A protein has these predicted regions:
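HHCC-type zinc-binding knuckle of retroelement integrases
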Residues: 1-226
Length: 226
């Protein structure tokens, strides 16, 4: 039988991340394969990639963890996942690009998921969230959400209508996650209802592979551990 290209094997195992990211992992000694080369075009990636043009990158970066958190809600998905989920919300730290995802059955759960996220990260890091950037979706603009942010000293940054590029970090994160999910699902024989598990796998992987924005992996910057 034909041997599997080890580089392609790791490409699939790592959620179909780019060859550039894989090379950095290999150069840093984080990939166990002693061989690193190229492989033929990945059909799953071609099926998974979206065709919209990329968002421009924001030029101002946070100088510390939790200084700025980007958030965006995605859904409803065309297929309900195991557990009855149709939406997910992301919270991404600007400095480290470390991201959290939460599966949701309804958009209205966004506020509760933010409080869950806030309690965990502020307790773990010993810091407080300063800014929360999101679009003007109704899930972010309830009086309850606004009152909570004020009580905790968190300034909301709501992007103007029709300007998703201003919330580009969240938009790029969600696009990358969905590209990875589509690539993984097209490569497997699993029912589409397993997309929630694929999404959690993609988020876990993204936090542990090199980012274009930072020198270390997001996980290393977030935890201070290599």
């Amino acid at each position: 039988p034909n041997e599997i290209n080890p580089t392609y094997f790791w490409h699939c195992r790592l959620g179909h991340i780019s060859l550039k990211r894989m090379k950095k992992l290999h150069d840093d000694g984080l990939l166990t394969s002693t061989y690193f080369g190229s492989f033929e075009t990945c059909e799953s990636c071609l099926l998974g990639k979206m065709t919209k043009s990329p968002f421009a990158k924001s030029c101002e970066r946070a100088s510390e963890l939790l200084e700025l958190i980007h958030s965006d809600v995605c859904g409803p998905m065309s297929t309900t996942s195991k557990g009855g989920y149709q939406y997910f919300v992301t919270f991404t730290d600007d400095l480290s690009t470390y991201g959290y995802i939460y599966l949701m059955r309804h958009k209205s759960e966004t506020f509760e998921k933010f409080k869950e996220f806030q309690n965990e990260v502020e307790n773990q890091l010993g810091k407080t969230i300063k800014l929360l950037r999101s679009d003007r979706g109704g899930e972010y603009m309830s009086q309850e959400f606004d009152d909570h942010l004020k009580s905790r000293g968190i300034a909301p940054q709501l992007t103007p209508p029709g300007t998703p590029q201003i919330n580009g970090v969240s938009e790029r994160r969600n696009r990358t996650l969905l590209d990875m999910v589509r690539s993984m699902m097209s490569k497997s024989d699993l029912p589409l209802s397993f997309w929630g598990y694929a999404l959690e796998t993609a988020a876990f992987t993204l936090n542990r592979v090199p980012s274009k924005s930072v020198d270390k992996t997001p996980h290393e910057m977030w935890t201070g551990k290599s």
